[in-house]
Design a protein with these regions (language model features):
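Catalytic phosphate/metal-binding cores of nucleic-acid and nucleotide-processing enzymes, i.e., regions
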Residues: 1-82
Length: 82
């Protein structure tokens, strides 16, 4: 794993990976990249990722906060960092 930061938030059915490193989309600019997974597979999640894409990058911390709220709304589950 490249040097940087990573958090994984468990929402029951989905997990949200949040990273920032020299290889992530926007990481060298201090921005974040997210991916949503369902078990071992990354998945598209309408309202979170774009159709045909399982990763979303170049996100500010406010963008990430908004995504955390959206996934909470979608799942009805309070996220827990794992």
């Amino acid at each position: 794993m490249p040097k940087g930061v990573q958090a994984i938030v468990d929402f029951g059915k989905y997990e949200l990976s949040i990273i920032q490193n020299e290889m992530s989309y926007g990481g060298t600019q201090g921005l974040y990249e997210i991916a949503v997974s369902d078990g071992d597979d990354q998945v598209e999640l309408p309202g979170i990722t774009e159709t045909g894409d399982t990763v979303k990058g170049w996100l500010t911390s406010d963008d990430v906060d908004a995504i955390l709220i959206k996934i909470h709304t979608i799942t009805g589950t309070e996220g827990k960092q794992i």
